[in-house]
């Protein structure tokens, strides 16, 4: 998110396909629903902070992948501490459980540990300077373990998910990172 002059700008970003599949992706009801879980959760969390404005859902191209994207702006009623905004917004259902409770977050950490996944996947980081703040969440990464390179990835699983499609999405995300780093 970006915070500038009492206005918070953030986005819902969820649903993934290859850029070559953009047209079919635009009508994929499962991917739209997955995106809407994220967008609606953000709106619900932000509505108490001020006047919210959700922009139209569009498709954002990021390298070889496309994702559904909805910009969200909030005119804050009062100044909010940055750490409160980070904890309010992170993780969204794109990276974490829904509903997000201490129990479901604990379950996610336990599953990640059991699967050998890094517990710190999707960490927020940012810059705060002269009243301006920008916080990003790093969701694509590589990790070295001695001579080996790991490229973790995740996907949103909802009731309509099909296992073969989710495995494909995981592979697409890892391939996009590998191509950037040449591994």
Would you name each region that the model predicts?
Residues 9-111, 182:
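Contiguous alpha-helical scaffold segments within structured protein domains
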Residues 1-33, 37, 120, 129-154:
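An anion-binding catalytic pocket shared by soluble metabolic enzymes
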């Amino acid at each position: 998110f970006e915070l500038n002059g009492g206005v918070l700008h953030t986005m819902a970003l969820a649903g993934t396909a290859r850029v070559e599949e953009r047209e079919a992706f635009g009508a994929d009801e499962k991917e739209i629903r997955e995106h809407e879980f994220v967008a609606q959760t953000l709106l619900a969390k932000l509505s108490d902070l001020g006047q919210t404005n959700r922009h139209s859902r569009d498709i954002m191209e990021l390298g070889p992948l496309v994702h559904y994207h909805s910009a969200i702006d909030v005119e804050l009623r009062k100044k909010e501490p940055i750490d409160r905004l980070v904890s309010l917004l992170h993780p969204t259902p794109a990276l974490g459980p829904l509903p997000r409770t201490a129990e479901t977050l604990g379950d996610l950490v336990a599953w990640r540990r059991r699967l050998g996944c890094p517990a710190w996947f999707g960490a927020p980081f940012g810059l705060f300077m002269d009243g301006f703040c920008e916080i990003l969440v790093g969701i694509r990464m590589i990790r070295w373990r001695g001579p080996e390179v790991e490229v973790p990835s995740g996907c949103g699983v909802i009731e309509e998910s099909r296992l073969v499609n989710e495995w494909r999405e995981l592979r697409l995300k890892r391939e996009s990172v590998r191509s950037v780093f040449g591994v």
